[in-house]
């Protein structure tokens, strides 16, 4: 016997969370809980403002339609990426496809203070990897900060994310301030320039490896070996159903690229599922999931070790 619940939620964010030049005051989303007999599966649907093509309201309409179809024994997944992902996660839990084992390690987001980063990395097992957002300030400043971090912590590897912020000139200004001897310890720089051609040229000219992120979601993107490209960063909430995520990981691995499962600022429930997806599809690769600290609360499933309070399902607004 199939049954389902849909919940709507809104989580206050810490001050200072800015996405694409707009402040994110709350993180808005939905949960779906599917039941079939004794089995249960959850999924999160939370389009990311400025990045997702669909809005929260559009996702809600599509989710409710899909749930009603599922209750009538239709198993086709919705097209909308966030709804397809959340629905497929709920189904994967329900059927036991999504393993319980999780990789709760996370590459810490660094604000540029090497002393703070040293403390955060001290307890980190294995490779020391951190992430730095670049492109928000002057490119020269970014280059100096990255150089300082790599100089201060000799076994550090950095993942950098520019979100296509730089012109080719700005990207070169950044690289100029990073010691060539340290550049191999930049694991990758996500999407430095506005076009893929400019980003590839930057990688060839500087020896700094790059990764694709936004490009994966463009209709003309194809997986191919390219000089200077070392990784792809996959954000499942923006990608679609789990099968599509699996296909992208497989395509990347077939080319010898690193595939990184990354957060779209999901709630704790969504983050714990991403940790499981990472352990399942990209074992041994540190996922990019260090975003829970941007929120003021957790929901339904807490992240291990987090001190944030956690709401249970009864405290959420139920739509169905």
UniProtKB/Swiss-Prot annotation:
Its EC number is 4.2.1.113. Its cofactor is a divalent metal cation. SUPFAM superfamilies: Enolase C-terminal domain-like, Enolase N-terminal domain-like. Disulfide bonds: none annotated. GO terms for biological process: menaquinone biosynthetic process. Keywords: Lyase, Magnesium, Menaquinone biosynthesis, Metal-binding. One of its GO terms (molecular function) is O-succinylbenzoate synthase activity. Mg(2+) binds at residues 161, 190, 213. Pathway: Quinol/quinone metabolism; 1,4-dihydroxy-2-naphthoate biosynthesis; 1,4-dihydroxy-2-naphthoate from chorismate: step 4/7; Quinol/quinone metabolism; menaquinone biosynthesis. Pfam families: MenC_N, MR_MLE_C. It catalyses: (1R,6R)-6-hydroxy-2-succinyl-cyclohexa-2,4-diene-1-carboxylate = 2-succinylbenzoate + H2O. The active site is at residues 133, 235. InterPro entries: Enolase-like_C_sf (IPR036849), Enolase-like_N (IPR029017), Enolase_C-like (IPR029065), Mandelate_racemase_C (IPR013342), OSB_synthase_MenC1 (IPR010196), OSBS_N (IPR041338). Converts 2-succinyl-6-hydroxy-2,4-cyclohexadiene-1-carboxylate (SHCHC) to 2-succinylbenzoate (OSB). Belongs to the mandelate racemase/muconate lactonizing enzyme family. MenC type 1 subfamily. This is o-succinylbenzoate synthase. It comes from Salmonella arizonae (strain ATCC BAA-731 / CDC346-86 / RSK2980). The lineage of its organism: Bacteria, Pseudomonadati, Pseudomonadota, Gammaproteobacteria, Enterobacterales.
């Amino acid at each position: 016997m199939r049954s389902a619940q849909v919940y709507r939620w809104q989580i206050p964010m810490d001050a200072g969370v800015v996405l694409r030049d707009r402040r994110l005051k709350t993180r808005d989303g939905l949960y779906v809980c599917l039941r079939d007999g004794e089995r249960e599966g959850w999924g999160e649907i939370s389009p990311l403002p400025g990045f997702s093509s669909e809005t929260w309201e559009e996702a809600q309409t599509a989710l409710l339609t899909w749930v009603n179809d599922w209750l009538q024994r239709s198993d086709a997944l919705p097209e909308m990426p966030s709804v397809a992902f959340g629905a497929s996660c709920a189904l994967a839990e329900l059927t036991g496809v999504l393993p319980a084992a999780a990789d709760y390690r996370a590459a810490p987001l660094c604000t540029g203070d090497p002393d703070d980063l040293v403390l955060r990395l001290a307890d980190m097992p294995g490779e020391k990897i951190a992430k730095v957002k670049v492109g928000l300030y002057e490119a020269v400043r970014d280059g100096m900060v990255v150089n300082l971090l790599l100089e201060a912590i000799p076994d550090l590897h950095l993942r950098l994310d520019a979100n296509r912020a730089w012109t080719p000139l700005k990207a070169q200004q950044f690289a100029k301030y990073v010691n060539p001897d340290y550049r191999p310890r930049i694991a990758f720089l996500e999407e430095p320039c506005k076009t893929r051609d400019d980003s590839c040229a930057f990688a060839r000219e500087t020896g700094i490896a790059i990764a694709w992120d936004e490009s994966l979601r463009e209709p003309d993107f194809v997986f191919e070996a390219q000089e200077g490209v070392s990784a792809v960063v996959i954000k499942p909430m923006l990608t679609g159903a789990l099968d599509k995520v699996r296909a992208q990981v497989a395509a990347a691995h077939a080319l010898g690229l690193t595939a990184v499962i990354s957060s779209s600022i999901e709630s704790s429930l969504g983050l714990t599922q991403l940790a499981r997806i990472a352990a399942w599809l990209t074992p041994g690769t540190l996922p990019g999931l260090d975003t829970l600290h941007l929120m003021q609360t957790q929901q339904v499933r807490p992240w291990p070790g987090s001190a944030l309070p956690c709401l249970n399902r009864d405290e959420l607004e139920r739509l169905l």
